[in-house]
Amino acid sequence: MKAAITTTAKYLPEEIMSNQDLERILDTNDEWITTRTGIKERRILRDPKKATSYMCTEVARQLLEKRGISADEIDLIIVATMSPDMLFPSTACLVQGNIQAKNAWGFDLSAACSGFVYGLYTGAQFIESGNCKKVMVIGADKMSSILDYEDRTTAILFGDGAGGVILEAANEEGYGVLDARLYSDGLNGREHLLMPGGGSLHPASHETVDQHMHFIQQDGKQVFKAAVIAMADVAEEIMQRNNLTAETIDWLVPHQANQRIIHATAERMGITEEKVMMNIARYGNTTAGTVPICLAELDEQGKLHKGSNLVLVSFGAGYTWGGVYVRWQ
C-alpha cells in the first residue's frame, strides 16, 4: 500500500518585491539578478504579526476545503521549515491548534530547502505502515525574517511562501509515492550555507546581533557547484532505479533555487524545457515551499493526470538533497 497525494494547496503573500525594488536598497540591478538566477520578483509577508505558521495554516485550511474533509480526520501534520515562528513549540503544533485538528499529532522537520522532499517521504511511511490514514505535509518559510537586506548575495534570492499536500493510501497498485533517495553531507556542507546565530552554540546576544549571525550566510559558488552535481545525480539515480526515461517522465519538479541549476538538472536527465516546472521568476526561492508550490500550480492548471510520472528533486543546507518518484493517482 503506497501513499498518494490526494490534494494540493499553496499560499503566497500578496506583496511583491521586484528586482527594481532591490535596486533601491542594494548595489545590484535587474539584469544582473535575472541573468544569474532567473528571478524577477518574490513575495514578502510584511506583517510582523504573521509568521510561518500563518502561511502554513492558510495552506492547511485550503487542503481541508479542497478535499472536503474536517480537521478531525487528519492524523498527522508534518511541517518542513527552517524559519519556525519560534524554536518551540513546533510550527506543526501551532497549525494543529489553529485548524483544531484534535486527533492529529505533529512535528517540524528541518532539512532547509530539501525539507518538503524529506517530509513527503517521511509522511508516506506513516501511510504505508497503516498507522495513519491522512497525513498533511506542508513546506513553508518566511525567508524575509532571516535575510540581511544589506547582503546582495542572499537578499536577491529568497521569498516567502508555503505549499502542502494531503497523503492518503493509493487507490490502486503502482500509483503514489513509489521511490525516494535522500542524502546528507554534514562534513562538507555545514560551513557553506547556514544561519549561525540563535542556537545553543551561539545563543542570541548583543555580539551575535552585531555580527549579523541571525541571518543566512552562504558561499554562493560552493553551494551552486554542489547543488548542480547533487540534484542531477539524484535525478539520474531515480530514473535508473525506476526504469524511467526522458520520454516517460511527464514532469520534473525541481527545487527553485536557481534557473541555471534547474537547467543543468534537466539537461542531465535529457528532459526538454516543456517538462520542467519553473516559477522561480515569480517567487524566487521559498526554500521548503518551492516544490509543493510547484505541485499546487501544476494541479491548478490541470497538468497532472492519472499516471503522470513526476520526479521531485531538491538540494539544501546541510548539505541535504534528495529525489522522489511520484506516479499521480
Curated annotation (Swiss-Prot):
Q: What is its EC number?
A: 2.3.1.180
Task: Extract one GO molecular function annotation from the record.
Answer: beta-ketoacyl-acyl-carrier-protein synthase III activity
One term under GO cellular component: cytoplasm
- Which pairs of positions does the record mark as disulfide bonds? none
Give the pathway listed in the UniProt entry for this protein: Lipid metabolism; fatty acid biosynthesis
Q: What class of enzyme is it?
A: transferase
Residues annotated as region ACP-binding?
256-260
What are its GO biological-process terms? fatty acid biosynthetic process; secondary metabolite biosynthetic process
Q: Which residues form the active site?
A: 113, 255, 285
Which InterPro entries does the entry link to? ACP_syn_III_C, ACP_syn_III_N, FabH, Thiolase-like
UniProt keywords (A-Z) are: Acyltransferase, Cytoplasm, Fatty acid biosynthesis, Fatty acid metabolism, Lipid biosynthesis, Lipid metabolism, Multifunctional enzyme, Transferase
Q: Where in the cell is it found?
A: Cytoplasm
- Family of this protein: Belongs to the thiolase-like superfamily. FabH family.
For this protein, the record's HAMAP family field holds: FabH
Name recorded for this polypeptide: Beta-ketoacyl-[acyl-carrier-protein] synthase III
Q: Which organism is it from?
A: Chlorobaculum tepidum (strain ATCC 49652 / DSM 12025 / NBRC 103806 / TLS) (Chlorobium tepidum)
**Origin organism lineage:** Bacteria, Pseudomonadati, Chlorobiota, Chlorobiia, Chlorobiales
In the UniProt record, the gene name given for this protein reads: fabH
